[in-house]
Amino acid sequence: MNQEDLWKRFYAVVGGEPQLYALKQIVTYLLNLIADPKASSKDIARVVSSDPALSANVLKIVNSPIIGLRNKVSDLVLAISLLGYNQIRDIALEISVSQALNAKQNAQMMRLWKHSFYCGKISEIIAASLGRMAGEAFTMGLLHDIGKILLAYANYDAFETSLNNYRYQRGKVLHWQSEQATIGLTHAEIGGLACVRWQLPDLFYRVIWYHHVPPAGNSKSEEIYLSQVVHLADTLCWNLNHPSVNSVNPYSGQKPETLLSENLLAEVGLSKGRFQDVLTKVNESLKTTELIFNFMKSSN
């Protein structure tokens, strides 16, 4: 498909200019503040305290059995210091997205959101273990399936058609292959083209476009490196039973070390020993995150 036909197909599928729900302004501001190395717990507490739901959830979690403190905490600054900035980021994103989901599509969209979020977490852990671009890896992992989310919001019938075909195939094809066959574009292509329309840096377009088929070769290039990291994280996410859609999971039940290509692990810079360390950290992180999210739902 040439460039012109690609764009025509894109607009036909998403029904015009690509649009998504917006994160609450406070969450956007908070994410930028957390990314600022000069920001202090007091700065973050000042923003958190302006949102009652966010403040309440931060205090509920820091005082919950999950954290296991002996003494109760009522000071937001102390709570933020104890939980850590990344945990505050996670809570803020969870609240914002949960409030944005509509009731009709809630179950599928929540599954898709959790998969995206967990892929971001795993990408961050992999990149942190390699000492390179952990923050960028989280963002790319979080946004890797933005094409699925955009498609589901803009044209749920097309999203459902590709999903039903994928379910019918029962693991014989991957979801993106089902999309290509039914709607003529994959979610990776939709997400990549949306990034172009939104005038995001080229790195977003390239990593999202290639996250299913990352370029081979050494990972000195940021584009190749992040594509490989997100691909590894996405595969692990499915393997750990956090898929983006409810269907037969072709990756479930397999050992991660046999599922992933040794060449890809080597290219991204992960030895077998370091990969096992990554798996341990991933399991610990996702277990804690799942407990916190479930606690937030049960206590609201």
Predicted regions and their residues:
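Conserved alpha-helical "signature site"
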Residues: 1-161, 174-258, 295-299
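Terminal helices and disordered tails flanking the catalytic cores of nucleotide-processing hydrolases
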Residues: 1-13, 258-300
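Short glycine/proline- and charge-enriched loop/turn segments
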Residues: 166-176
